[in-house]
Amino acid sequence: MNNKERGESIRHQILKDIRQHPTDISRYIADSFSITLQAVNNHLKRLEEEGWLQSSGRGKGKRYFPGDMREYRSQFPLTVDFTEDAVWREQYSFVFEGLQENIVDICQYGFTEMVNNVIDHSDGTLIEIYAFRDKERIVIIIADDGEGIFKKIKRLCDLQDERQALFELSKGKLTTDPDNHTGEGIFFTSRVFDAFEIDSKGVKFSHSDQFDFIGNESGTAVYMLLKRDSNRTIQSVFDDYAGPDEFQFNKTVIPVRLAQYGNEKLVSRSQAKRLLLRIELFQNVLFDFDGVSAIGQAFADEIFRVYAQSHPDIDLVPVKMEENVKKMINRAISSRVSK
């Protein structure tokens, strides 16, 4: 370990132990790393200047506290005693202290939902959790060494491939354990955060391009980002996907671009049927054509005429269409209306 790496290790340990040693952190770290008190105090001064620590008092009465900049990372074995609420409360809640109530609520919701998914579904042995905040954003990363979310969904739901598993996950109401889960956790978590990504063995589910991480080769990694000035609330997002005065999750948004494999065009009825899988679970379905430059006549006809006529109780709404896409959809809708 070179001097730079050793310095980072010391600072990391200070931040990890500061809450347990607010008054004796200098002596504790000096003993732990066999360094002088002056060396520790230099690290403390730097951390305070950077916003990672704050202090009160002077001399022997000086106390240190976490600053506005905070982070915590740890790894835990997935034992029967490990629970999402306990690890939040005992290990990570301090990272979010002092933030707006809506921000804390969103972070706790996403944190506990994704950790619970690992506990109940990953079949892994270890979980690693990282939480970070600076002046502008909060980042939460949760990774496991299990089978991999898309591989497991493909296997248990008998889907064509892992890409189809990703696509079904994006719709919502997908669970491999219907007796104990609603399939809504990932759907809503991905929408309450400003950025959300799942990376599992090279297959990525993302609502943004704000992350730049090395692909996860084993298990599953979930990345969540929330801006500190967000006014979003969990309730407002839930209301967006439930009808007026209803408590049922009855609306979904389907990112049509996920149905494309590589450079292929969306032209066939088989592709459309893959898109339509399980949408009978919803009353309102928005087809988001963002990033789709063109579609074929058969693809449009299968969704907006054939399926629409056989499912009149489901509202199918295309959005974010380029002109070529809009023309093809309008043609299919006109054919339906004229019959």
Q: Whereabouts are the PLM-identified features?
A:
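Bergerat-fold GHKL ATPase/HATPase_c domain
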Residues: 1-112, 121-124, 236-277, 281, ...
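Short acidic, S/G/P-rich loop/turn micro-motifs used as interaction or catalytic elements
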Residues: 230-231, 262-265, 292-295
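Short, non-transmembrane amphipathic alpha-helical segments
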Residues: 299-310
